[in-house]
Design a protein with these regions (language model features):
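Proteins enriched for Cys/Gly/acidic motifs involved in redox and nucleic-acid/cofactor modification
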Residues: 1-101, 139, 154, 175-193, ...
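Conserved SAM/AdoMet-binding glycine-rich loop
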Residues: 86-212
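Conserved N-terminal phosphate-binding loop of PLP-dependent enzymes in the Aspartate aminotransferase
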Residues: 122-123, 227-228, 243-247, 251, ...
Length: 323
């Protein structure tokens, strides 16, 4: 038995990998899909619509751990959304491993799914937990921004703002395509004096071969072009069996730590700018049931947390507020 202190978290995964060397595991059952939804809160539910991934990004073991992309038919998902609505829940977050790849195993597609979910009575708001930029089509954006129940909240993996690193990661887009997608969403969604779109962006720092100059391409791309409301920052971690793990040009941990801090500082700056850009804007808030020291919280459509004095009359209700 090994015990790790709070400062030794980086040793946990290598230690586990060392212990399981030589242990064989079966992939039996990875072709199954087990639909599920959670309803721990009275206001929001997470509905799993997809599992697995067919992408083979050079740093990732998810396709091997979770199997190929798969899902159940839309005809079986709609009743789950209806059951959620019957519990009085008004917001659903769609989840999956590669959510936008929905339909590969049933001959359908993600656009088919969201259009049918939009018609479920009782559900007033939808969020997409994460979607690959190449799977978020202009046709889909046009529909989402036409007055549907889908909110102006996008979680999109970028991973790197440097084309050299994107190619070496095995990603399926370049920075020009990514920037064009972000700009298109803003053009279709935002009006003067109205809410700004929330973009949450995933970024990996310290991928093998990422020099200081290449990292700064990512930094400047985020700061000057994408300008997200939030950056989810992950230091690259070697995964046995992946092409990236075998590379000799690994980045030192101390360099990764420095780059993470730089992006955390940038994230704080960009998030503050996002909040200021929404100040004075009217938005709808769905209040949650939790009593936090006499206060209750809820989120606007563009994912700004709003607090007010606790009042059970507001639980599960959508009300307009001025930010």
């Amino acid at each position: 038995t090994e015990v790790f202190g709070a400062t030794e978290k980086s040793r946990i995964v290598p230690s586990i990998l060392e212990k399981v060397k030589g242990i064989e595991c079966s992939d039996k059952g990875l072709g199954n899909f087990f639909p599920a939804y959670s309803s721990g809160e009275r206001t929001r539910s997470f509905l799993k619509v997809q599992d697995g991934c067919d992408y083979k990004c050079h740093y990732c073991t998810v396709p091997y751990a979770r199997g190929e992309s798969r899902n159940i038919p839309i005809s079986e998902i709609i009743p789950q959304a209806e059951a959620i609505a019957a519990e009085g829940i008004k917001e659903i977050v769609l989840t999956g491993v590669n959510t936008g790849d929905f339909g590969r195993s049933t001959g359908e597609n993600f656009f088919d799914l969201i259009r049918q979910l939009n018609d479920v009575e009782g559900i007033e708001r939808y969020r997409i937990s994460s979607i690959e930029p190449n799977l978020l089509t202009e046709e889909m954006i046009d529909w989402i921004t036409s007055g549907t129940k889908f909110l102006p909240h996008y979680h999109i993996p970028l991973q790197s703002g440097c084309d050299t690193i994107l190619r070496e990661m095995g990603r399926r887009y370049d920075t020009a395509a990514f920037a064009s997608k972000i700009e298109y969403i803003r053009q279709k969604s935002e009006v003067p004096g109205g809410p700004k779109v929330f973009f949450g962006i995933d970024v990996i720092v310290g991928f093998p071969g990422e020099t200081d100059e290449l990292f700064m391409e990512t930094y400047n791309f985020l700061k000057d072009v994408v300008r997200p409301a939030f950056i989810h920052i992950f230091p690259y971690s070697r995964r046995a069996g992946t092409p990236a793990a075998e590379r000799k040009d690994q980045v030192q941990d101390c360099v990764k730590t420095k780059r993470v801090q730089m992006l955390e500082d940038l994230c704080a700056q960009l998030h503050q700018e996002f909040l200021e850009a929404n100040t004075g804007v009217e938005e709808s808030v769905l209040f949650e049931s939790t009593d936090r020291k006499g206060m209750m919280e809820g989120y606007t459509g563009n994912y700004i947390r709003i607090s007010r004095p606790y009042d059970p009359e507001f639980i599960g209700k959508i009300v307009n507020v001025t930010i």
